[in-house]
């Protein structure tokens, strides 16, 4: 067994011995041993770049049918990815799921509003964190939905005030610091509003809406094993914290764009908020319309709307995605402002968080007045929201949404420098452009066969068996395809298939004539041989001296030329211009 002190190179060699060339596992014990050691080994980025262990482990993970091994490999790769991607090391510290944020809107772990001694929150947070590490694509959603149901039951029960501190992690936000998000009020009036809309229905609608709106951002849901999917809630909370800090700098600390619940636990907390306050959730269409103080609030009410759109929750982490996220929301902002009825809470632009929130306090009373009347209106608009996935990360138009997008790789290995580096948005966009135009390529390729046949063919081409090559099925299908492409594109020139056929016809005709072999003519089969079947006579002697006697004093070739035994004979026995030189039988020197 390999010890834990083995170097990465040794572990790589051992792993290579345990798998075949197609990454299929040949020695499961050795592979498990290597992964166990790698889990304990404090590997560095340089060692990963040098050994390419990440690629090997990922290939093994894809090929293996052992679920436990695949999970361990995936977790190992995620840990390495956090090591490689700059700025990812502090992600779990700054914003783990369901850890309450500070009163000023940032997710600072040292400043909490809820006492740490409360048992239910302290249990939920580590459990969610560990689940999020392993199954960050599935488990948090299940956990959050079950916690939502529990909270709904507890909120509807008669002992609501007694259980308030236990059921909600973030309740002190409303009671302790009302102005933190620019809204006046206490939990009591907000809870009274719930009587107008059944809380269970709102909660179910939000669950359904949350499921639909996972589609919008990337247009294709990323594979759970893709290397970019780590700590999604933590990362969006990290991004929000930085944006909110910038907002505090701009506004001089007089107002806070977001309450702590928005920056710490994006999805579960805000859905609870929206269910508790039907005034914020129900009139999502009316709150966003320009008729409500639109001069003061250009974007769709940044502070009243929770920052939990799928655009923030689903976007993958890493500094490289920060720019993408910002540009996505700016793009979204321009689309949505021009269409006020569709400006919903989940499509709020990130840039709206930076705007001043003066004048928003008056809006709440207006929203409360319109809360009951706009309930049905809000539900109608919600039905159209799953269709609003017209914005992609690369900013493509809505017509391109039917075209499947390639899975984006967050990390790439540069063979020139030998380093693993994050894939910048510019590079990925250029790659997509390169892959996006495969159609003109065949017409470019057809230029080469068109130019070659008319030119004088050098000697090596004559030695190529073009006839046999042309009968090859692959070449035939390729030439037919190219010919069809040219024909369908309206080109008047002949395709490569035509030129190849013409060339082969001409070559076959040329080759047939020189194929006549230049050899010696066979000797006449004479029945009598002088000196063998009969005696030699004077006529035989005269004939030898004065006449051509094939097989006796010389021979003919197939061209009718006579060679006696003192001549050198040059023949072409195969008809391919290869010479066979025969020395004289008799040398007179």
From Swiss-Prot:
It is found in: Nucleus. Belongs to the Mediator complex subunit 26 family. This is Mediator of RNA polymerase II transcription subunit 26. Residues 259-268 have a biased composition (Low complexity). Residues 83-233, 247-320, 363-441 are annotated as: Disordered. GO terms for cellular component: core mediator complex; mediator complex. The keyword Hydrolase does not apply. Residues 276-297 have a biased composition (Polar residues). Component of the Mediator complex, a coactivator involved in the regulated transcription of nearly all RNA polymerase II-dependent genes. Mediator functions as a bridge to convey information from gene-specific regulatory proteins to the basal RNA polymerase II transcription machinery. Mediator is recruited to promoters by direct interactions with regulatory proteins and serves as a scaffold for the assembly of a functional preinitiation complex with RNA polymerase II and the general transcription factors. Residues 190-213, 398-412, 424-435 have a biased composition (Basic and acidic residues). Keywords: Activator, Nucleus, Transcription, Transcription regulation. It comes from Danio rerio. It holds the Pfam family Med26_M. SMART domains: TFS2N. Gene3D superfamilies: Conserved domain common to transcription factors TFIIS, elongin A, CRSP70. GO terms for biological process: positive regulation of gene expression; regulation of transcription by RNA polymerase II. GO terms for molecular function: transcription coregulator activity. Residues 10-87 form the TFIIS N-terminal domain. InterPro entries: MED26, Med26_C, Med26_Mid, TFIIS/CRSP70_N_sub, TFIIS/LEDGF_dom_sf, TFIIS_N. Component of the Mediator complex.
